[in-house]
From Swiss-Prot:
GO terms for molecular function: ATP binding; catalytic activity, acting on a protein; magnesium ion binding; phenylalanine-tRNA ligase activity; transferase activity; tRNA binding. Binds 2 magnesium ions per tetramer. PROSITE patterns: AA_TRNA_LIGASE_II. It comes from Agathobacter rectalis (strain ATCC 33656 / DSM 3377 / JCM 17463 / KCTC 5835 / VPI 0990) (Eubacterium rectale). This is Phenylalanine--tRNA ligase alpha subunit. Its cofactor is Mg(2+). It is found in: Cytoplasm.
Length: 341
């Protein structure tokens, strides 16, 4: 019996030694130590061994099992270490290789226009005021010479949150807050999002506006025209000129629409200016006396002008975008082409 156990031991150790992988080791383990393994068969045959020999046979079997298991464990650890080393080698990062360059991001076209306009206006001495998007009906309409029964309220489809509060339809509401908080002279621009129930190729339910207000002694429409001339030259080029057309806004009198000479065809007529040679860019006017008086400003001493610029409109003109929805779709194929830097 001892010779048989010794043969099993030598055979197992030899096969373990020449095994070339974990799969082969598992085969050896099953063949020697498994339920149907050779060493297990010896234990099952103990009933045929003389009683006085059984302790010795059991000892030989246990010694063989321990030797086989020890060598198996050592070989398994060796193969696992080699596999881990190969994995590390395959995944190793060569730190000397050039890295992939990060893609340069651009500011959104509307943000670029907002920053450009803010820089132009601050260079002219304007302060920047940030208003609130949820506004009181009084500041959005009533204080701007548009009381509840005024037909001019129908000029804008408004998102009401309650009978008293709404999503502001114009940054003009910021004028009232500023005039209530400050005494003239006042020179301020107020950029921000506004909300109207509009949705087509040139309008969006949410868009960005920049309101401007100047209040001081002796302010006239001529001052407005001079400021606008400087603005468009800095924004669109020194050869661009402006013209004023009569219009109507309840909070200015007189009111004007401001056009710029087409910077694409230079007045000859093209698709951008629809053959007219002029492009509408903003609305403006002399602040209505009722608006000033409502804020406690003496209209015998002070006057002012105001203007409102749609930033998406300027971005579309400046960057040749023909549909306002492209500014809200986050399409990198469009946005990657626009970078003033």
């Amino acid at each position: 019996m001892r010779d048989k156990i010794q043969q099993i031991r030598e055979k197992a150790l030899a096969e373990i030694d020449k095994a070339d992988g974990l799969e082969k080791l598992n085969d050896v383990r099953a063949a020697i130590l498994g339920k149907k393994g050779e060493l297990t068969a010896v234990l099952k045959g103990m009933k045929d061994v003389a009683p006085d020999e059984r302790p010795k046979v059991g000892q030989w079997v246990n010694e063989t099992r321990e030797a086989v298991e020890k060598l198996l464990d050592e070989k398994v650890k060796k193969f696992e270490a080699e596999a881990l080393k190969r994995k590390y080698e395959s995944e190793k990062i060569d730190v000397t290789m050039p890295a992939k360059r990060s893609k340069k991001g651009n500011l959104h076209p509307v943000t670029q226009v907002k920053d450009q306009l803010s820089e132009i206006f601050t260079s002219m001495g304007f302060e920047v005021y940030e208003g609130t998007e949820i506004e009181n009906d009084y500041y959005n309409f009533t204080a701007l010479n548009t009381p509840k029964d005024h037909p001019a309220r129908d000029m804008q489809d408004t998102f009401y949150l309650s009978p008293e509060f709404l999503l502001r339809t114009q940054t003009s509401a910021g004028q009232i807050h500023v005039m209530e908080a400050k005494k003239p002279p006042i020179k301020v621009v107020s950029p921000g999002k506004v909300f109207r129930s509009d949705d087509d190729a040139t309008h969006s339910p949410m868009f960005t506006q920049m309101e401007g207000l100047v209040v001081d002694k002796g302010i006239t429409l001529c001052d407005l025209k001079g400021m606008l001339d400087q603005l468009v030259k800095k924004m669109f080029g020194k050869n661009v000129t402006t013209r004023l057309r009569p219009s109507y806004f309840p909070f200015t009198e007189p009111s004007v629409e401001v056009d710029v000479s087409c910077f694409q065809c230079h007045g000859k007529g093209c698709s951008l200016c629809k053959g007219t040679g002029w492009i509408e860019v903003l609305g403006a006017g002399v602040v209505n006396k009722k608006v000033l008086e409502g804020c406690g400003i003496d209209t015998n001493e002070y006057s002012g002008f105001a203007f409102g610029i749609g930033l998406e409109r300027i971005a579309m003109l400046k960057y040749g975008i023909n549909n306002i929805k492209l500014l809200f779709e986050s399409d990198l194929r469009v946005l990657d082409q626009i970078d003033d830097n």
